[in-house]
Amino acid sequence: MSKCATPTPSTSSNSSDEAKRSPQPMSRGFPQRNMSTTSSNGSNSPRHRSLETPIVLQPATRFALANLTTTVLRLDFWDDNDPNSIFFCKSTFNIVTQCLDLPEKVIKTVKTHLEGEEDLTDIAPMIMSVREDPVYKTEGSTPFLASLLVAFVNQGNYDSRYRVFLRHLTTLLGVVWTEFEDVEDSLASTLLEEQFVESEHSRTVREKTARNKKIKRYLMIGAAGGVGGVLIGLTGGLAAPLVAASAGMLIGGGAVAGLATTAGAAVLGTTMGVAGAGFTGYKMKKRVGAIEEFSVETLSEGVSLSCSLVVSGWIESDTSPDQAFVHQWRHLRHTKEQYTLRYESNYLMELGNAIEYLMSFAVSVAIQQTLLETALAGLVSAVAWPVALMSVSSVLDNPWNVCVSRAAEVGEQLAEVLLSRSHGKRPITLIGFSLGARVIFHCLLTMSKRSESVGIIEDVILLGAPVTASPKEWSKVCTVVSGRVINGYCETDWLLRFLYRTMSAQFRIAGTGPIDNRNSKKIYNYNLSHIVKGHMDYSKRLTEVLNAVGVKVGPHSEDSVVDLTQLEGPHEATGQAEEAINYQSTGEEEEHPIVHPINLENIHEVKVLDSPHKNEF
């Protein structure tokens, strides 16, 4: 019979303040979290849920769930030309059928649908069959999904494709995604609140491996990380399994019985990244290329089975150094565990100052009119721009070109960090605007060249990206992203066009228009022209932009979201000129973004951009 897990309330442990750390200018990993700070007594911690009550599903329900999951795998993940996707689908199918405890004959029948030997069945009767089950009527579909979650995590690698797969299932089974996130967060808190210690056997194996491979330096890095005295390298913890005391008692039995073992605790420690020294445990002894500053800092103190990393595009002159990479993201609530990348702050500060200086020359009515006509025509030729603007262009060109080059190198370095799994073997979402989006884009391009890159990145959100709009390059990015790749653009971003004025007329910038996504179901284009009044608005109105593309943001006052159209000074010209552009183009272009019809292959998409919470993920 099938056993699934039912979430029920449990207890929590005490919390204490985390010791303050100074930022590490050249660190290579996520900050190590103090276990005590992740207690559920904190305001951001989830309610505890024990995953232990066995639930028995009817045979018809189990068969329907098997067919439903097989259909999702076949339509959304199977690719005949990609061996990795085929392997993922088959291994996931095996986990699901094992969880459902199906007879071998039934498994063989359902598997023919997965492999394309038989036509897929209609999903509507499957969903109706599930809803008729007594368990569904009393508990909903969450017990089954929670059981799958535990089974996936117990593999020691919460692959980002697992999470996207579960997201698709929650949509079909009518489970609110935030409720499922509560289950994830509860499991994460339960695991991280334990006191992890290294077993004697693990220590012996680790030390022997270290001697053989001459990686004593990595052991010292592990000591600096300070995770209960565990000395490990950059692998995220595979070389040093951990033992969680009383894990079996606190996690419970039933569907999670496998997690109560020493091995289960070890792989979960690896999944969460708690077995690793974290990003701050490693300090680069020398520069990587031209990079002078690279570190990942904590943005929020929660814990989760997934995390987010944000990358800013520049630093504004009125921002303090400590808040330079934090303030813009202060309302972000995408996941409970969020990080921000600090990189090349001196150069990004110079760029911010240069942009503000250039904008001060765009105040006159004459220049506004010229910018209006130039942007409307979509011109990038140097001869089309005002002489007054061109006369000071060198002030911006030099810092921009320096930052563009360094952003690409930072992206390559970020790829190495993510491939090292310092954040743990769990999904991570990347969000960036302007040059931050460029960092992420080059990170993904670098990862696309590596075979071990699949299953790490869940979603990617690029806003005002100063990168090519070539479908060929974006298709490479899609190969390493399990979920969505969002391109947020502004058609009237004259500053971005101005910065690329020396490029050929055939060159298209992603931040100024949609990406051709006819051959990719992962790419989503969002026209943000009705929110963004200029390139600098990606920083000033970031909360509104994030809300528009479906990223969760926290409560905020109207004063905290700046309306640039009401500001005086350098930003005024941008707002007035581009409001005129929007007004003149109302009859010719759609105000809303390009969208696709919702189907099973793209069940995580939303049509209406102006309904901020419909596309949350």
From Swiss-Prot:
Annotated transmembrane regions: 219-239, 262-282, 427-447
CC terms in the record's Gene Ontology section: membrane
Keywords: Membrane, Transmembrane, Transmembrane helix
Chain intervals for the UniProt region annotation (Disordered): 1-49
Cell compartment(s), UniProt: Membrane
Coiled-coil annotated residue ranges, if any: none
Primary location class: membrane
Annotated family: Belongs to the TMCO4 family.
PANTHER family: TRANSMEMBRANE AND COILED-COIL DOMAIN-CONTAINING PROTEIN 4, TRANSMEMBRANE AND COILED-COIL DOMAIN-CONTAINING PROTEIN 4 TMCO4
Name of the protein in question: Uncharacterized membrane protein F35D11.3
